């Protein structure tokens, strides 16, 4: 009998510090009305100076493991999706492994920006279904606030910090029915942090020029996102032999309310079936989908047997969707 992978548990963690749009009115040329009408964002959470991505990730991880009714020692693999790691070396996943005491786990990071969690779920599915690992912890965690340029009002107001996690393991029925992913490196300059890597190493000049902060070509990303969010959802549904009328709930990447609305319209999906929390947290990159998934589950929006679509897009450019028959 073939092993089928599914979601065994979910969890999330948000930093305590919350900043509304009026905070940004005081430090840059913007307004609550401008931010709200263009993005749907009202507030976002920022980590403390002393908090790193691994701190947020560890707390979300422990909640997901508890939800799955497992012990930390049961985790055999940790996949952590992030674009804001604690440091270049070692991987943030290894730091989390040590922090939570997952002594039996292999650990590595992946970098696919806002698509990272879906990429992680896809990788975990293969490992579980081929029998390589039984219980895989997938985490999406970010501290984007530490990589913002407050001279760039179009980008600085968008991002927030947080972490979400899911335990992927064998299920008797349902589970992860299909996934679809894609990448287009021609769009590499649409979303980037230019300095700090081997292309442009850190220096006094790069720091002074704000080249260690997130840069985004907003209009290009918007057009790409609306097209790809719907397209990749349809591809994943097709692989699962389902269509849009079979969707019980959509959990999209929370980047912009207009992108979410436009994508849902293309899928002919009522917004009542779409989870939205961008107003509370802004764009949390790889943490966006797992945080939304955890909240949707705990609020009773997702029920056992539901067909749930997780879909995201991000820098790279990258995109991905997973169709999950909910088993919790």
From Swiss-Prot:
The keyword Lipid biosynthesis applies. Coiled coil: none annotated. Catalyzes the condensation reaction of fatty acid synthesis by the addition to an acyl acceptor of two carbons from malonyl-ACP. Catalyzes the first condensation reaction which initiates fatty acid synthesis and may therefore play a role in governing the total rate of fatty acid production. Possesses both acetoacetyl-ACP synthase and acetyl transacylase activities. Its substrate specificity determines the biosynthesis of branched-chain and/or straight-chain of fatty acids. The active site is at 114, 253, 283. One of its GO terms (biological process) is fatty acid biosynthetic process. The keyword Lipid biosynthesis applies. Residues 254-258 are annotated as: ACP-binding. GO terms for cellular component: cytoplasm. Pathway: Lipid metabolism; fatty acid biosynthesis. It catalyses: malonyl-[ACP] + acetyl-CoA + H(+) = 3-oxobutanoyl-[ACP] + CO2 + CoA. GO terms for molecular function: 3-oxoacyl-[acyl-carrier-protein] synthase activity; beta-ketoacyl-acyl-carrier-protein synthase III activity. It comes from Clostridioides difficile (strain 630) (Peptoclostridium difficile). Belongs to the thiolase-like superfamily. FabH family. Homodimer. Its EC number is 2.3.1.180. The gene is fabH. The last Arg residue of the ACP-binding site is essential for the weak association between ACP/AcpP and FabH. It is found in: Cytoplasm. This is Beta-ketoacyl-[acyl-carrier-protein] synthase III. Keywords: Acyltransferase, Cytoplasm, Fatty acid biosynthesis, Fatty acid metabolism, Lipid biosynthesis, Lipid metabolism, Multifunctional enzyme, Transferase.
């Amino acid at each position: 009998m073939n092993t089928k992978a599914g979601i065994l548990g979910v969890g999330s963690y948000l930093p305590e510090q919350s900043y509304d749009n009026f905070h940004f009115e005081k430090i840059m040329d913007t307004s609550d009305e401008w931010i709200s009408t263009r993005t749907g964002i009202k507030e976002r959470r920022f980590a403390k100076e002393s908090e790193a991505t691994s701190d947020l990730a560890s707390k979300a991880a422990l909640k997901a493991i508890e939800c799955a009714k497992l012990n930390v020692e049961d985790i055999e693999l940790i996949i952590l999706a992030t674009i804001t790691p604690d440091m270049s070396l070692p991987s943030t996943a290894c730091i989390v492994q040590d922090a939570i005491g997952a002594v039996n786990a292999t650990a590595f990071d992946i970098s696919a920006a806002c698509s990272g969690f879906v990429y992680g779920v896809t990788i975990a599915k293969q490992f579980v279904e081929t029998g390589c690992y039984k219980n895989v912890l997938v985490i999406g965690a970010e501290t984007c606030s530490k990589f913002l340029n407050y001279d760039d009002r179009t980008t600085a107001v968008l991002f927030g910090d947080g972490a979400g996690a899911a335990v992927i393991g064998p299920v008797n029925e349902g589970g992860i029915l299909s996934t679809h992913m894609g990448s287009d490196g021609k769009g590499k300059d649409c979303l980037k942090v230019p300095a700090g890597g081997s292309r442009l190493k850190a220096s006094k000049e790069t720091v002074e020029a704000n080249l260690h902060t997130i840069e985004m070509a907003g209009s290009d990303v918007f057009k790409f996102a609306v097209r790809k969010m719907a397209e990749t959802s349809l591809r994943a549904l097709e692989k699962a032999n389902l269509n849009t009328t079979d969707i019980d709930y959509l959990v999209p990447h929370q980047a912009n309310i207009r992108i979410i609305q436009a994508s849902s319209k293309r899928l002919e999906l009522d917004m009542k079936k779409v989870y939205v929390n961008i107003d509370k947290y802004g764009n949390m990159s790889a943490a966006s989908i797992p945080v939304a998934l955890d909240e949707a589950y705990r609020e009773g929006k997702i029920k056992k047997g539901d067909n749930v679509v997780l879909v995201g897009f991000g820098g790279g450019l990258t995109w991905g969707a997973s169709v999950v028959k909910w088993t919790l």
